[in-house]
Amino acid sequence: MDIEVKKKRFLKGVISVPGDKSISHRAVMIGSIAEGITEIENFLLGEDCISTINCMKNLGVDIELKGTNVKVQGKGLYLNKSEKILDVGNSGTTIRLLMGILAGQKFETTLTGDDSIKRRPMGRVITPLSMMGAKIEAREGNFAPLTVFGNKLKGIYYKMPIASAQVKSSIMLASLYADDKTTIEEPYPSRNHTELMFSSFGAKVEVNGTKITCYPGYKLQGQKVIVPGDISSAAYFIVAATLVPNSEVTIKNVNVNPTRTGIIDVIKEMGGDIVLTNERTINNEKVADITVKTSRLKGIEIGGSLIPRLIDEIPVIAVAAVFAEGKTVIKDAEELKVKESNRINTITSELKKMGAKIFETEDGMIIEGTGFLKGNTVESYNDHRIAMSLWVAGLMAEGETKIKNAECVNISYPDFYKTFDML
């Protein structure tokens, strides 16, 4: 499906965004290996999270979905062997986190996914899980499809070469099956939803700076999980309301976990008018309402420990940078190359088609703030984050912008276009 977007004169309104993708995935997985019932409210009905539900069902877990409410009947740590190959669709979170759970089972499981998943690096998970005693056979180059042979696992000390919440979470899930404690050291803190959820479900986790230690032998008990709105989905409205003239948008009940709020910090540093109200804590997660007003932005440099806190938002930050005064430099973001698309390359090439002065670098991009884009036909590369970022670009471009394969937003935000139409 192709979709057309035209320049907007203003954006005004109060909206909610769907449940957080990271928390939705983890609630289903951890609920599945806990004992008793886990009830999840405001679950994200995106394709990726549905892939997680389907995989857990194939492993013998009883899961009931009614609207955005999910009821998981936990089986405890040990699941049933799947009769079929598990298909994770487009979901990197599903395949990487599931590998951690499957490493400690008493059977083997084969995992596959779509073409994008088959191009994404799995070695970063295979290496630490193998050190723990897991046996994993993958396609040459450590790509999916891959087979995980469940085994007795041992605790390890693992120093991660890059900050990745998916890799960290996979090791943490495997650590539940180990004979001794496991310590993970990150170069920078990545999103910590797994640590927070482990604690609320009864696992023993100690966090000391960038070191996370998990202890086996603690029973996980089913919980009630209320999933806050996803800040990665809110990011498109934050940037759009900052750029489009005469705008004021409030986004209700958004997850403002400090490991995820890089987008707010960056837009504020660029000159954005963003106010958080009604701040509270739900299931160990910080939640707030976010109000954004039109602002004039200036270019800045973004890199280092900030990158893991906004890795998924960099494409839409690039759009904001086009309308900032001066130059914006984004560095230390090589991780973007191994997302659903090579996001450094894809956002650069598509914004160039719209007239942006944007240049790809080895680990990021440089954007000259020209304050101008013209409508064109652009490609989403079947990457939901690219499609949504280009939609925001289209709201500011002269003329009409056509986004090809725009339905890929269903991965994380099926009602994305509809929500914008409400403003």
Curated annotation (Swiss-Prot):
SUPFAM superfamilies associated with the record: EPT/RTPC-like
Assigned keywords, A-Z: Amino-acid biosynthesis, Aromatic amino acid biosynthesis, Cytoplasm, Transferase
One GO molecular-function entry: 3-phosphoshikimate 1-carboxyvinyltransferase activity
Any one GO BP annotation for this protein: aromatic amino acid family biosynthetic process
Catalytic class of the enzyme: transferase
Name the UniProt record assigns to this protein: 3-phosphoshikimate 1-carboxyvinyltransferase
Pfam families referenced in this protein's UniProt entry, alphabetically: EPSP_synthase
